[in-house]
Amino acid sequence: MVEDGRNAVRRWAGWAILALAVAVPACSWTRSQEPLWDDVAHYRQILQQTAYEDATCAAPEPTATAGPPIMIDDAAPQQYWDLTLQEAVELALTNSTVLRELGGALIRSPDLLETIHQPAIRETDPNLGPEAALSEFDAIYSSNVLVEKNDRALNNLFTGGGTQLLEQDLAVIPFQIEKAAATGSRFYLRNRIDYDANNGAGNRFPHAWNWLVEAEVRQPLLQGAGVEFNRIYGPSGRLGAPRGVTIARLNTEVGLAEFQIAMRDYISNVENAYWELYFAYRDLDAKLTARDASLEIWQRLRTLQESQRVRGENEARAREQYYRFQAEVQNTLVGRLWEPTRTGNGTTGGTFRGVQGVHVAERNLRLLIGISLADGRLIRPIEEPSTAEVLFQWEEISTEALVRRTELERQRRMVKRRELELLASKNFLQPRLDVISRYRWRGFGEDLMGGGDNGTPYPDAWANLMTGDFQEWALGMEFTFPNGFRQAHAGVQNALLRLARERAVLEQQERQILHDLGNSLADMKRAYAIVQTNYNRRVAAQQDLDALQERERTGQEVDWDQLLESWRRVTDAEIQLHRSLVEYVMAVKNVHFEKGSLLDYNQVQFADDCRSGLASSAAL
C-alpha cells in the first residue's frame, strides 16, 4: 500500500512539475558549457553585431532634415509663403508632439519639456497612477505545488507515529484568493490539499489525503479603518507615502494642469515669434527705403561734386549714411543671434524684443510650428496688428484671473492633496486593532476523489469534505501599540507644515498674478498711447522730409545735411511706429495670458475630458 501511495504521489508530482513547466517556459534558460574565458570570439561577434545594428538604423524622417539656411549672399527667394497668425497656431498644434521652445532647452534638459504624451504617461504610471492605486483592490490569486521526500531517523517513537526511521512522501498544494476592500477589510479564501504517505505504525491508512477549505476576514477597527482613509492612503500606503485612489487622481490632475500651462506657453511663444517676424519685415522695409534714398542722394551729390557745385564733405556724409543703412539692412535681413521674445523674458507672456532680423525670426517661427527648417520659401506674415483700442474692466479681469489661471488650479489641487494627507495621517495616531475571523471545512480520506464504498469510514477526502463532518472556526483580535506614537506625531506635524506651505504659496501666487495682470494692463495702455504718439511723430517727420524734397524739386537751395538727417528721422519714426504697434498687440495678448484666457483668445480648446478632469476635484 505504501508503494501504491508512492506511485500516486510520483504521478501527482509529475503532473505538477509538467504544469509548472508549461506555465512558465520563459523562466528557463541554457548555460553554455564552454569556459567563458577561453575564447573572446563570442564577445567580438556581439560587438560586431551591435555595431552593425547601430550602423543600419533607420534614416531620419524627412521632417527632421532640412536644406541649407538662406545666407546673406544668396539671391532673394523666388517664393514667399503668406501666413496668418491663425494658420501658424494651427500648424503648431498639428505638429506639437513636443511643446517646443526657443533657447535650446530641448537639448539641455529634454526631460523637463512637456509633450502631448505627458497626460497619458502620468495617467498610466504603474506606480503612482490611478490604475496603480485601483489595482490595490484587485483580487490576488496565489498557488504553489510542493512535493517532498523525507527519509530520517527520529529520536522519539511517538513523534514518528510509531517508528523511529521515518520514510515519507509528502505533497502540499495550496491555493488562495485575497481581496482588499475600501473599508480596510481583507478577505481570504483558501483551498489546501495535502498528501501524506509514511511508514508510521499508528496510521489509519498507509497514505491519506486532507482537503481544507477556509475563509478568513480581517477587519481593522482603529488604524487603517474607513473608506476615507483607504481612498487617501490605500491598503498598502505607509505614513508619509499615500498611494490611494484620491491622491493618484489629484496627482494626475496636477500633471494635466502642468500640460495646459506648457501648451499655453507654447501658443504664446508661437504668437511672439509671429510678431517678431512681422516687425523684422517692417524694420527691413523702412531701412531699405532709407538706404535707397541715401544712395540716390549720394549719387546726386557725387555728380554735383564733380561739377564743383557742392563740397566734398557733403558727398562723404551722404556716402557714410548710405553704408550705415546698408549695414543695418544686412543685419536686419539676416539677423543676429540675440535673445528672442519668449515667455518669461521680462513679463510672464514675454516682453517684445524686436532685435532678430528676418531670416533668424523666420527660422525660429519654423522651429516652433514644427515645419521644415528650410524649403526654399520665406514665410511672410500678412496679418496686421489691430489699432483698435481694447478696453478691460479691472474688476472683471482680476476675478477672471483668480478663477481661470491654471497655475492657481494646480496649486489648489496641491492644497487639497495636503488637506487630505493631513486628515488621513491622523489615523496613524491610533493603535492597530484588527478583528480576525476564520471558518474552515476539512475533508479526510484514503483517496483524494472517487474512493467509492471500500468499507472504510473515510474512502476519499472530497466526499468527506462535502459531508461537513469536520468544521472549525476561530475568532480573535490582533493589537499593535507603538509606545508614544513618535513616528505618527512626526507625520501629522509634517502634514501640517506641508499644508501651511501650499496655502502660503497659493496666497502669494494670487498676489503675483494680480501684480502681473496689473502690469500687463498698464503696459497695454502705455503701448496704445505710444502708438498714437509715434504716429504723430511719423507724420511730422514725413512732412519735414516732404518740405525738403519739394525745395529740391523746385530748384531752391537745400541743406544736404538737413535732408540726410530728415531721412534718418523718418526711418526711425517709421520703425518706432511699427514697434509700438507690435508692442500693443503683444500687450493685449499678455493681458489675456495673465487672466487665463490666452488659449480661448487664439481659438484653442482642450477636449471635454481634459477640462472635466480639472473640475473633478470639487467632488473629492
Locate predicted features.
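Amphipathic alpha-helical coiled-coil segments
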Residues: 115-116, 120-133, 258, 262-287, ...
